[in-house]
């Protein structure tokens, strides 16, 4: 019998972090503080980084970051993650990074494909992110019903998915979310980036009836509000209410909407009490304590999920999210402190 409580799905990427990357920025025409998908002119960048620079490998990909965060908070064998990787050295690096955090993976491995990667080029306090999805967008729905994965899907009580996954894997997302709703389990969706509700709104709206908890930041909330024709897209409280009250397949389980807003208060609305908007203060860091905010949203989701899976109340789960995000912001990339800090 599986002991896993949380099943996460997304695009597995290995972050390749290099410092003093001014020459790389110049050579590949990159901005110092940016995040883009790789174009053809960037494709040699990854090999060059590995061969000619001192690389720090960090397991990346939004849902994988959140899954590692949840695993950091929970006992071993609590969290399992799936996504598609290639049969290459990057996948092995990814497995090693996950093992450090206590995250187990059930990858679909595509022979002859390259694992997705994100080049993180650091210059001073700036970070230029260049992502190539590669194998990540080759995920197959049949993997969810495979002999290795189906028992994991059935055993857990919680599911988590990044919004990025709907760009190529909507059928898989709907299968997982549908199973969750049918058994009155908890399905959590993170919007992940403003372009997801902006350009993939039909996919989001198709998935939403099965979603029990939505996590988004203020920009993603505004993008969803604009795409859905909301009259006041920057009014986080009003948007949270509207999102909470969208149609739901399993009305027995109320929908919770959580909007983070950087160092500002986190907004929470529960469809069981749509008139009540709750806010949670963020314990702000001094400017000098902030090392890297990349992955802070994923760390929040990880801490929140860890507490939720451990049976904590919603309030405590939001606070656990804040706590893990604060730790992550003081590290390079989406990483956590060792020896472990007690989150729960």
UniProtKB/Swiss-Prot annotation:
Disulphide bridges: none
Keywords for this protein: ATP-binding, Kinase, Magnesium, Nucleotide-binding, Purine salvage, Transferase
EC numbers: 2.7.1.20
Coiled-coil residues: none
The protein's annotated pathway: Purine metabolism; AMP biosynthesis via salvage pathway; AMP from adenosine: step 1/1
Catalytic activity: adenosine + ATP = AMP + ADP + H(+)
GO cellular component, as recorded: cytosol; nucleus
Residues annotated as the enzyme's active site: 298
Pfam families: PfkB
SUPFAM superfamilies recorded: Ribokinase-like
Biological-process GO terms, alphabetical: AMP salvage; purine nucleobase metabolic process; purine ribonucleoside salvage
Broad EC category: transferase
Origin: domain of life: Eukaryota
GO MF term list: adenosine kinase activity; ATP binding
InterPro entries according to UniProt: Adenokinase, Carboh/pur_kinase_PfkB_CS, PfkB_dom, Ribokinase-like
PANTHER family (UniProt xref): ADENOSINE KINASE (PTHR45769:SF3)
Name assigned to this protein: Adenosine kinase
Organism this protein belongs to: Schizophyllum commune (Split gill fungus)
């Amino acid at each position: 019998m599986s002991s896993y409580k949380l099943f996460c799905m997304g695009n597995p990427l290995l972050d390749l972090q290099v410092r003093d990357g001014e020459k790389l920025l110049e050579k590949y025409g990159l901005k110092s503080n940016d995040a883009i998908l790789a174009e053809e002119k960037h494709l040699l960048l990854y090999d060059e980084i590995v061969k000619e620079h001192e690389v720090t490998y960090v397991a990346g990909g939004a849902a994988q970051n959140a899954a590692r965060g949840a695993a950091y908070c929970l006992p071993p064998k609590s969290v399992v993650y799936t996504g598609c990787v290639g049969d290459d050295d990057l996948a092995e690096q990814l497995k090693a990074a996950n093992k450090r955090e206590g995250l187990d993976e059930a990858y679909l491995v595509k022979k002859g494909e390259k694992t997705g990667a994100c080049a993180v080029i650091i210059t001073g306090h700036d970070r230029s992110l260049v992502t190539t999805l590669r194998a990540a967008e080759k995920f197959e729905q049949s993997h969810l019903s495979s002999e290795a994965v189906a028992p994991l899907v059935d055993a857990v009580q919680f599911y988590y998915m990044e919004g990025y996954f709907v760009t190529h894997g909507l059928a898989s997302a709907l299968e997982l979310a549908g199973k969750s709703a049918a058994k009155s389990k908890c399905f959590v969706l993170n919007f992940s980036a403003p372009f997801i509700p902006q350009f993939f709104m039909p996919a989001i709206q198709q998935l939403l009836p099965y979603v029990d908890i939505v996590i988004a930041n203020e920009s993603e909330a505004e993008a969803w509000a604009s795409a859905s024709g909301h009259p006041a897209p920057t009014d986080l409280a009003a948007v949270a209410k509207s999102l909470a009250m969208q149609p739901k397949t399993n009305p027995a389980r109320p929908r919770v909407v959580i909007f983070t807003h950087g160092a500002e208060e986190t907004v929470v609305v529960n469809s069981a009490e749509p008139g009540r908007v709750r806010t949670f203060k963020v314990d702000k860091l001094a400017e000098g304590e902030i090392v890297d905010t990349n992955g802070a949203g994923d760390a929040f989701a990880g801490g929140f999920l860890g507490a939720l899976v451990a049976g904590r109340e919603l309030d405590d789960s939001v606070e656990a999210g804040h706590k893990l995000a604060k730790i992550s912001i003081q590290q390079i990339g989406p990483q956590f402190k060792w020896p472990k800090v007690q989150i729960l």
